[in-house]
């Protein structure tokens, strides 16, 4: 059994770590609330433009944008959103597993895979795995802006325009609630038609485009892609802070349990030392 002094040192070390994890839990909780506000502020725009795009995809347009055209999927692209920092449980690895499973499905069909990566954790993971990475960006901080994402998104859109990609997917963590974050894969291109049967059945009209459909749709479809990627980034950020808060709370609770266990061991060691000293005193007195 370790000595009382050694155990006391361990208890002090665990208490110091517990203070750090408690502080990180409180910081993550504060950042999560701000991230949730940003996510909820941008979500109505992202959802509305997605509905508009759903109508456009179902419409009989006089101008057919290339993003609306289905083609054989020989080259598939993914925009993968991860965190820049760790200590957030299995958030990133669960996302990577889902992405890899989907990629493997396409590879079995003979498709080539190309990635654009947002976040240092995904950058390190996929670069080390030998994946073909066309663009990467990290260090977006706690308040990412659309301007920070345009470069990586633009690379993938240019490849799609040139026919170097036939499908484009967005991979991110969807914020369900504080305890649940779900990895999700959304199809960006070609434009997914609405999943709503009611919309498809009732959609018997078209928009009136002013001045011309081509420039309007070109701008609208670009905004759609940018808004979906940005929404994925802010949702992933809210997931990161929620996962970190939960992980740090678990670490703090585990530290409390460990301190209790060490305190019990310390008390036993101290009791054994006192018993030994008393035995030595009694033995010495008897010898006299």
From Swiss-Prot:
Gene Ontology MF annotations: ATP binding; proton-transporting ATP synthase activity, rotational mechanism
Subcellular location: Cell inner membrane
Ion transport as UniProt keyword: yes
InterPro entries, A to Z: ATP_synth_F1_ATPase_gsu, ATP_synth_F1_gsu, ATP_synth_F1_gsu_CS
Assembly with partners or alone: F-type ATPases have 2 components, CF(1) - the catalytic core - and CF(0) - the membrane proton channel. CF(1) has five subunits: alpha(3), beta(3), gamma(1), delta(1), epsilon(1). CF(0) has three main subunits: a, b and c.
Name of the featured protein: ATP synthase gamma chain
Keyword terms, alphabetized: ATP synthesis, Cell inner membrane, Cell membrane, CF(1), Hydrogen ion transport, Ion transport, Membrane, Transport
Classification via HAMAP family: ATP_synth_gamma_bact
Topology relative to the membrane: Peripheral membrane protein
One Pfam family recorded for the sequence: ATP-synt
GO cellular component, one term: plasma membrane
Highest taxon, organism lineage: Bacteria
Similarity comment: Belongs to the ATPase gamma chain family.
Role description: Produces ATP from ADP in the presence of a proton gradient across the membrane. The gamma chain is believed to be important in regulating ATPase activity and the flow of protons through the CF(0) complex.
